[in-house]
Design a protein with these regions (language model features):
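TPR/TPR-like (Sel1-like) alpha-helical repeat modules
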Residues: 56-64, 136-138, 283-293, 322-337
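Fold-core signature of tandem repeat domains
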Residues: 63, 104, 115, 186, ...
Length: 343
């Protein structure tokens, strides 16, 4: 495989960038960089080790090995495009975008996701060919005047005369392209990174599509989307379906799903249909509360206290273990549940 030291010209770099076999090591480094970048770039339940130094090393190796994916991905990982790295870039952002866009059009799910991310995060302002997709072709003065006469606001009229596109329109166009490519990636089975697509629909108050995205991704194995789908089922009184999704999420160590499943077994919710449908198992619930308490999420303190109360009140014939109770209440205190923490 060619190293960056073997690349003498831009033509050499583009030849590698356009050849999947020649750039495969660079692409592998790009994906490895994402793994090391932490849960914001993978998914929390994967438990991949977060290592900033390895992230930058892998990403820089990827860029120097002419990976279009790595080159574009660097726009998303803060601090990656240092002046030194940008100087060593073998291909431009435009070259990288063109190559990834071509593979996205051929049906590559990860490339489709990368293109969607370009428009979601508005990285098009660094990529001429992406920016061009958001703006219509130049119009003659005659057409500009005609358009200005039919504009709904003074701002739109001025923009029409200047031949520019209002920021609101650019944002709408970018959002539409992001949705298009994220949906294509989801349809092709890429489920782990669909939070951005769901968030777009939520921001647009398009809750039907937000639910569709969550359920599709959940069915494909996304733990967080299992939680969201379960919560949606719960809110709509579909307790058996919610229980199923919380169980699946908990099996993949999704923190909130573990807590919700514990609440279900504990019959925490005062809903007759839930209590008729879900078996009451306080011992299993306390075990799940203890498991959830070890996680880092907003309700971890609550789950620690629930587990402590289970032992304090002998729920399900649990032993009165003051050492364990002290550990659990201390855990609750360290996770911002000070009000009920015992001394």
């Amino acid at each position: 495989t060619l190293l960056e030291s073997d690349i003498d010209t831009k033509e050499d770099a583009l030849k590698i960038a356009n050849d999947p076999e020649a750039r495969e090591l660079g692409d592998a480094y790009a994906l490895l960089a994402r793994v090391y970048a932490g849960p914001r770039f993978t998914w929390e339940e994967s438990n991949f080790p977060e290592d900033n130094m390895r992230t930058y090393q892998c990403l820089h190796d990827s860029i120097r090995r002419c990976s279009p994916i790595g080159t574009l991905q660097a726009l998303r990982i803060k601090g990656s495009i240092t002046p030194t790295v940008e100087k060593d870039m073998q291909i431009s952002f435009d070259d990288a975008f063109r190559i990834v866009y071509d593979h996205a059009n051929r049906g590559d799910a990860y490339c489709q996701y990368v293109i969607g991310n370009i428009f979601f995060w508005r990285d098009d302002n660094r990529i001429d060919s992406a920016e061009a997709m958001l703006t219509p072709p130049p119009m003659s003065w005659t057409k500009r005047i005609q358009k200005s006469l039919t504009a709904n606001s003074v701002q739109d009229r001025i923009a029409a005369l200047q031949g520019t596109v209002p920021d609101e329109t650019l944002q709408e166009n970018a959002s539409n392209l992001a949705k298009e490519w994220f949906n294509k990636a989801l349809d092709n089975g890429l489920a782990m990174f669909q939070g951005n697509l769901r968030n777009i629909y939520i921001d647009e108050a398009d809750f039907s599509n937000a639910r569709r995205v969550a359920k599709t991704a959940a069915e494909l194995g996304n733990p967080a989307m299992m939680l969201y789908t379960g919560l949606d089922c719960h809110e709509n009184g579909k307790f058996e379906d919610a229980f199923t999704w919380f169980t699946k999420g908990a099996a993949l160590s999704q923190s909130e799903s573990i807590a919700e499943l514990a609440d279900y077994y504990y019959h925490f919710y005062d809903a007759k249909n839930l209590r008729c449908t879900i078996p009451y198992d306080p011992v299993k619930a306390i075990g799940l509360y203890r498991r959830a308490a070890t996680k880092q999420f907003s309700d971890a303190g609550y789950t620690a206290l629930q587990a402590a109360f289970g032992y304090i009140f002998h729920i399900g014939h649990l032993p009165l273990d003051w050492g364990l109770i002290a550990d659990l209440t201390h855990m609750a205190a360290t996770k911002d549940r000070f009000m009920f923490a015992l001394p």
